[in-house]
């Protein structure tokens, strides 16, 4: 069995069906003896260019180990499913189980956002104390 990285884009009007689609595709791979090494739902994102006048899509990425037969069946499912607007299959030398760069960047962005929001509350509390101490220093003079 070979390793593949599969990314498919789902029409934004069909975003609520992504869970069922992923379940169907993973079942197809596992029934043929394959393994899902990584599954990431990147959510709805802006496309770099419009595809059939659609500017956003729901992205899903899978790293799988499967047979050529299962992969061909999966590609047929993509081809005949109108909700899948694009797909990409890349052959890999080995299984990739770590987080993708896309997911890491998203987590870093959310962590920075949390850190940015947190100090505002902490600074205002600390700032009040320092202002009071400065005022008391000035009162002594």
Swiss-Prot record:
GO terms for molecular function: small ribosomal subunit rRNA binding; structural constituent of ribosome. Pfam families: Ribosomal_S6. Gene3D superfamilies: 3.30.70.60. Disulfide bonds: none annotated. Keywords: Ribonucleoprotein, Ribosomal protein, RNA-binding, rRNA-binding. GO terms for cellular component: cytosolic small ribosomal subunit. InterPro entries: Ribosomal_bS6, Ribosomal_bS6_CS, Ribosomal_bS6_sf, Ribosomal_S6_plastid/chlpt, Transl_elong_EF1B/ribsomal_bS6. It comes from the Bacteria. Residues 125-141 have a biased composition (Acidic residues). The keyword rRNA-binding applies. NCBIfam families: S6. PANTHER family: MITOCHONDRIAL 28S RIBOSOMAL PROTEIN S6, SMALL RIBOSOMAL SUBUNIT PROTEIN BS6M. Belongs to the bacterial ribosomal protein bS6 family. This is Small ribosomal subunit protein bS6. It comes from Pseudomonas fluorescens (strain ATCC BAA-477 / NRRL B-23932 / Pf-5). The gene is rpsF.
């Amino acid at each position: 069995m070979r390793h593949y990285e599969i990314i498919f884009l789902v029409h934004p009007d069909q975003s609520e069906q992504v869970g069922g689609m992923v379940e169907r595709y993973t079942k197809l791979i596992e029934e043929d003896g394959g393994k899902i090494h990584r599954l990431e739902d990147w959510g709805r994102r802006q496309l770099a260019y419009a595809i059939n006048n659609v500017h956003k899509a729901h992205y899903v990425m899978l790293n799988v180990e499967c047979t050529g037969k299962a992969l061909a069946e999966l590609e047929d499912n993509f081809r005949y499913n109108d909700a899948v607007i694009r797909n990409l299959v890349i052959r890999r030398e080995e299984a990739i189980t770590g987080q993708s760069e896309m997911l890491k960047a998203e987590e870093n962005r959310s962590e920075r956002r949390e850190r940015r929001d947190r100090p505002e509350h902490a600074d205002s509390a600390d700032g009040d104390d320092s202002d009071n101490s400065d005022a008391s220093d000035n009162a002594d003079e």
